[in-house]
Amino acid sequence: MSVKIAPSILSADFAELGAGVEAIATADYVHFDVMDGCFVPNISIGIPVLQSIRKRTALPIDVHLMIVQPERYVDQFCDAGADLVTCHVEADTPEKIHLALDKIHAKGKKAGVVLKPNTRAEAVLPFLDKCDIVLVMTVEPGFGGQKFIPTTVSRVA
């Protein structure tokens, strides 16, 4: 297993976003957190910011959708420059999550699912055949700068 570094653009100074993207030029990916205020209590960035970042970097962009009904938006995020899109298994019905993963792959992008810290690991099983990645959250989704939850480490192995 290799380690990949994907700094979150959510931590950037948005007045200096271009400089923030350039500062992570040696990373493996750019992690792009999307929050809708419904699935998580916070609202973050969206498609126009992704389009701007795509113009500033050749790095793969990993879009983490913390939104309800992700299948409604995956095409737009893929078209805006995402290389990898992940959806939370808790964000919709299994059928709709399957649909989101299918749409992502139909756009020629990598797809994956995400688990909140307290979601049972088995929740990913119905989706594994369509996943290029499984992201296990080590903090509660929705806010940057949180403390790491040590008990999540055992779920990753």
Locations of the language-model features?
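Conserved N-terminal beta1-alpha1 strand-loop-helix module at the mouth
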Residues: 1-86, 91-99, 103-113, 122-131, ...
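Residue-level recognition of the GNAT/N-acetyltransferase active site
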Residues: 116
